[in-house]
């Protein structure tokens, strides 16, 4: 039986700091915009995964899928550049690419 190509999944997790923000409502508003842009521009699935109760911090994790390793790396590079260009401060970033063959 012929084996199907598994494809690659990229995972990027980023710490965000909103020094000018003064409320959870303000943070949520900014995060909604950022998440929508990441989804639209890079086809990424995005979730806030930590610091829900803090109004100046957030951790976003996104994932993207492609049939090629290079394509996944390019998508994550683009997402990281997008995040770095925003008004908030970008902290620690973790990245990984996995495949079902791993």
List PLM regions with ranges.
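N-terminal first-folded block
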Residues: 2-40, 44-45, 82
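A generic structural signal for well-ordered coil/turn residues at beta-strand boundaries
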Residues: 8-12, 58, 89
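A structural signal for short, well-ordered beta-strand segments
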Residues: 12-16, 60-62, 93-97
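A generic structural signal for short, non-catalytic loop/turn and secondary-structure boundary residues
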Residues: 39, 53-55, 86-88
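A short linear hydrophobic-aromatic micro-motif
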Residues: 44-50, 92-94
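Short, charge-patterned binding micro-sites
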Residues: 47-68
